[in-house]
A protein has these predicted regions:
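HIT superfamily nucleotide-processing domains
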Residues: 1-114
Length: 114
């Protein structure tokens, strides 16, 4: 999608601080971190949100969660714990209409989150 911020980041048109990349997904640090470790993992294919996940594209979501688990171990926060968040739609405060998962770690999280 030509006007999508995350598609432009994935395509290299907009710089990012990359954490991880493979054929299906791209992970990069958040520009306004809400925790000592805060990065986003996005599918390379443009999927608008969790609400747009289908049987045809759900394998990439499973893959993203495998990547999150791998990165949590590599970056050393798997045992302490972390939070994975996806905001959906206007009421959910989704700011970029491209499916993404925030991974937050490095501090105790509070509840309720919003």
């Amino acid at each position: 999608m030509s006007d999508c911020l995350f598609c432009k980041i994935i395509g290299g048109e907009i710089p990012s601080n990359k954490v991880y990349e493979d054929e299906l997904c791209y992970a990069f640090y958040d520009i306004a971190p809400q925790a000592p470790t805060h990065f986003l993992v996005v599918p390379k294919a443009h999927i608008q949100s969790v609400s747009a996940v289908t049987a045809e594209n759900s394998a990439v979501v499973a893959h993203i969660f495998e990547v999150i688990a791998k990165l949590s171990k590599e970056l050393g926060f798997d045992e302490a714990g972390y939070r994975v968040v996806s905001n959906i739609g206007e009421a959910g405060q989704q700011s970029v209409p491209h499916l993404h998962f925030h991974v937050l770690a490095g501090r105790d999280m509070t509840w309720p989150p919003g």
